[in-house]
Regions:
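A short, N-terminal "cap"/entry segment at the start of jelly-roll beta-barrel domains
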Residues: 2-6, 12, 16-56, 105-106, ...
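Membrane-topology and secretion signals of cell-surface/extracellular proteins
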Residues: 30-35, 52, 70, 90, ...
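Short structured motifs
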Residues: 43-47, 100, 113-114
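A short beta-loop-beta micro-motif enriched in histidine and acidic residues
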Residues: 52-55, 67-82
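Short proline/glycine- and basic residue-enriched helix-capping loop/turn segments at helix->loop/beta transitions
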Residues: 56-63
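Short acidic-glycine-tyrosine-enriched beta hairpin
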Residues: 64, 93-111
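Glycine- and acidic-residue-biased ligand/ion/polar-headgroup-sensing regions
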Residues: 76-94
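Ligand-binding loop in jelly-roll beta-barrel domains
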Residues: 110-135
Length: 142
């Protein structure tokens, strides 16, 4: 009987400590923080969506080695780019933009040809979400 009483007291003590922790966790609020929102791309071009095919969302991780440069290209669908790590130089004609870790930008599907170069001393890691369509390429190299 004594063992049972000790076990019962232990169970009540443990649950009285842990139960408030669970209630506290449930009372914490979920926070939604907008990171980027625009109706235009990096070069000021309006964003539009492909209407001729089934919509398709794409999510990529892109790794650009130190000193590497992408081919000159365009995008037929709008995209959001987050530079998670590294430093980039984004060149569109005479317009040059520089980005560092934790910065983001939007590419319009109506934008001009451009290229991106890793100007940092570590591989650049980008996360890209494209609002595209089935069968539509993400990038068109020139």
């Amino acid at each position: 009987m004594r063992k049972f009483r000790n076990l019962l007291i232990s169970a009540i003590t443990i649950s009285s400590v842990l139960l408030p922790l669970e209630i506290t966790k449930a009372q914490e609020k979920i926070e939604v923080i907008p990171l980027i929102q625009s109706t235009k791309g990096l070069g000021g071009e309006k964003i539009s969506y492909p209407r001729w095919k089934q919509a398709e969302l794409r999510f990529f991780k892109v790794i650009i080695p130190v000193g590497a440069k992408t081919p000159t290209h365009t995008h037929p669908a709008p995209m959001v780019v987050l530079l998670a790590k590294g430093e980039l130089k984004h060149t569109r004609g005479d317009v040059i933009n520089y980005f560092s870790s934790k910065q983001s930008f939007i590419e319009s599907n109506n934008g001009d040809e451009h290229f991106v170069e890793n100007i940092g001393n570590e591989p650049a890691i980008l996360y890209v979400v494209a609002a595209s369509a089935v069968g539509l390429p993400t990038t068109v190299n020139k």
